[in-house]
Curated annotation (Swiss-Prot):
Entry similarity comment: Belongs to the pseudouridine synthase TruD family.
GO BP term (any one): tRNA pseudouridine synthesis
Species whose genome carries this gene: Enterobacter sp. (strain 638)
Gene expressing this chain: truD
Recorded catalytic activity of this chain's protein: uridine(13) in tRNA = pseudouridine(13) in tRNA
PANTHER family to which the protein is assigned, alphabetical: TRNA PSEUDOURIDINE SYNTHASE D
Active-site residue list: D80 (nucleophile)
Name of the protein in question: tRNA pseudouridine synthase D
Length: 349
C-alpha cells in the first residue's frame, strides 16, 4: 500500500515547501449544514465558535450546562481541536422553554446563535465546509500560483486524508493486525476507525494507480459514473463513451473509484479489472472488509474545490479560501500545492 505522502499527484509533485497551520488561526473551518433551524421542535441547534477544544469535549460541556445526558448532544462531524472552527451542536431539550445559552461558558468557545429544530442532527448530516487556510514560508510562489490555477480548472485527487489513518498510521496498522487475527474487536470506536481506515486506504490506492496514467480522466468501458453532487451512479457502456466523456469534461459527471467491501463494486469490464489489479497486493484488508460485512461503495475520483480564491500577503505567505463537500479533505488540496513537514494525521477531518 502506498503511504499518503507518496500517493500520485494530479499536477505532479510540488516543487516548493511550506508550512501548514503554524498556529490555530491559520486553519479556519466553517461548517455548512445546508439548511436553517426550523424554529420549533424538541431539539436546539447551537452554533459554536471554538479554538483549542475538540468537538466531543464541547458537546459534553454543553450537556452538563443543560443538565442532560451526554448522548442527548449530537453533531454532524468532528472539527479540529487546534484550529478556529464554527460548527453546530444539537441538544435534545423537550418543552417550550428556551434555555439561555448565552450563559454557556467554556474557555476557547463562544455561542454564536441557537434555535429550536425538529430533528436530531446526525453524523454526516452536513453539506460541506468552508475553509480559510494560511500557508507560510512558501519557497516557490510561482509554482504554487500555477498549481492554484490548475486546481481551479482540473481539481485534485479526492483522497481520504492522513487523518483517516491515525497518528503514524495507527488505525491502518490496527486494521492489518485485526485482519491477521480471528479475535473479535469489542471496542466499537476501534472497529469503526480500523474498518474506515482499511476501506479508505484501498480507495486511495485505486485512485493513485489510475492517476499514474496520462489519460486517467478518460472514461473506459465499465466505469461507474456519478452525477456531480449526487450519490447515484451508472455504468458506462461502449456505445455511450463519447457522450459521457463530454459530460465528464464539463464536470456534470464524475468518474468514481471503489471503496471496496462486500457485494459488487459497481464497475465492470476494463474498469473493474483495473481496480482489482490496483489493490491485488492487499488481500488481507479486502478480506477483513468482507468478513465484517462492510458494504462496497463508490466515491468520486476527483475533487473540485468550489469558490476557490487566494491572496498573497507577501512572497512567502498565501491565504486560501475554498469550499468542499462533506467527506472531503482540505489536506488533499494542500498536498497538491506544497510539500509540508509534520503529520497531517493530527488535523481532524
Amino acid at each position: 500500500m502506498t503511504a499518503f505522502e507518496n500517493l500520485t499527484w494530479l499536477h505532479g509533485k510540488p516543487q516548493g515547501n511550506g508550512l501548514l497551520k503554524a498556529n490555530p488561526e491559520d486553519f479556519v473551518v466553517v461548517e455548512d449544514l445546508g439548511f436553517e433551524p426550523d424554529g420549533e421542535g424538541e431539539h436546539i441547534l447551537v452554533r459554536i465558535l471554538k479554538n483549542g477544544c475538540n468537538t466531543r469535549f464541547v458537546a459534553d460541556a454543553l450537556a452538563k450546562f443543560l443538565k442532560i445526558h451526554a448522548r442527548e448532544v449530537s453533531f454532524a462531524g468532528q472539527k479540529d481541536k487546534h484550529a478556529v472552527t464554527e460548527q453546530w451542536l444539537c441538544a435534545r431539550v423537550p418543552g417550550n422553554a428556551m434555555p439561555d445559552l448565552s450563559q454557556f461558558e467554556l474557555e476557547g468557545c463562544k455561542v454564536l446563535e441557537y434555535a429550536r429544530h425538529k430533528r436530531k442532527l446526525r453524523l454526516g448530516a452536513l453539506q460541506g465546509n468552508a475553509f480559510t487556510l494560511i500557508l507560510r514560508d512558501v519557497t516557490d510562489r510561482d509554482d504554487v500560483e500555477k498549481r492554484l490555477a490548475a486546481i481551479a480548472e482540473q481539481g485534485v485527487p479526492n483522497y481520504f486524508g492522513a487523518q483517516r489513518f491515525g497518528i503514524g498510521g495507527s488505525n491502518l496498522l490496527g486494521a492489518l493486525r485485526w485482519a491477521q487475527s480471528d479475535a473479535p474487536v469489542r471496542d466499537r470506536n476501534k472497529r469503526s476507525f480500523w474498518l474506515s481506515a482499511a476501506r479508505s486506504a484501498l480507495f486511495n490506492q485505486i485512485v493513485s494507480e489510475r492517476l499514474k496514467k496520462p489519460d486517467a480522466n478518460q472514461v473506459v468501458v465499465g466505469d461507474a459514473l456519478q452525477l456531480a453532487g449526487r450519490g447515484s451512479w451508472f455504468v458506462a457502456t461502449a456505445e455511450e463513451i463519447t457522450d459521457v466523456q463530454t459530460r465528464v469534461d464539463n464536470k456534470t459527471l464524475m468518474i468514481t473509484a471503489a471503496m471496496p467491501g462486500s457485494g459488487e463494486w459497481g464497475t465492470q469490464a476494463d474498469a473493474l479489472a483495473a481496480e482489482q489489479a490496483a489493490i491485488a497486493d492487499a488481500p488481507e484488508l479486502q478480506s477483513l472488509l468482507m468478513r465484517e460485512k462492510v458494504e462496497a461503495a463508490r466515491r468520486a475520483m476527483l475533487l473540485y474545490p468550489q469558490k476557490l480564491s487566494w491572496n498573497w500577503w507577501d512572497d512567502v505567505t498565501v491565504e486560501l479560501r475554498f469550499w468542499l463537500p462533506a467527506g472531503s479533505f482540505a489536506t488533499s488540496v494542500v498536498r497538491e500545492l506544497i510539500n509540508t513537514s509534520g503529520d497531517y494525521a493530527n488535523i481532524a477531518e
